Amino acid sequence: DRKIRPMLDHPLIEYVGEVDEAQKVVLLKNAKALLNTIDWPEPFGLVMIEALACGTPVIVRGCGSAPEVITHGKTGFICASKLDFIHAIHDVDKLSRKTCREEFERRFSADTMVSNYEELYYRLLQKNSFPEATGSKEAQRSFGLMQLSRASVFR
């Protein structure tokens, strides 16, 4: 609080506090970019994906899932230093908001995610990747249910 509060008095900073989902979408859609400076290995990066869904480029450190979510120079910039962040902020207008949204649709939409999960489950079933059930009749029946065809499981 001692470090952050004084910075909020800057004329270029507007502290909006906690927001609901609708307000978050409005903020992301109207943002020039999402500046995500976390320096821990975030495993998924939902906030980056939410920004892309709004067509907003992301400027981020290259740790955690960032390199998997953001395509450097296309949907944002992956930065290693303060100087990289400065250049990225300066260059963010060169990125296409339409491309950010299209990349979200191609990689992270609900339809895409469902399709990817279906394909993964199908491959696992085809490879018989589950260990053979041994022991009780109930365990053997459960294993048999996992062997269903893709059509009966996913359609």
Question: Where do the PLM segments sit?
Answer:
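Nucleotide-sugar-dependent
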Residues: 36-47, 67-68
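Short glycine/acidic-rich beta->alpha loop that forms part of the nucleotide-sugar donor binding site
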Residues: 42-45, 52, 62
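Short hydrophobic beta-strand element within catalytic cores of glycosyltransferases
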Residues: 57-60
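A short, well-ordered alpha-helix in the C-terminal region of glycosyltransferases
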Residues: 94-110, 116-119
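C-terminal "capping" alpha-helix adjacent to the active site of nucleotide-linked donor transferases
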Residues: 77-99
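Nucleotide-activated donor-binding/catalytic signature segment of Leloir-type glycosyltransferases, i.e.
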Residues: 2-26
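Short acidic alpha-helix that forms the nucleotide-activated donor recognition element
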Residues: 20-31, 53, 71
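Short acidic/histidine- and often glycine-rich active-site loop of Leloir-type glycosyltransferases
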Residues: 62-73, 77-79
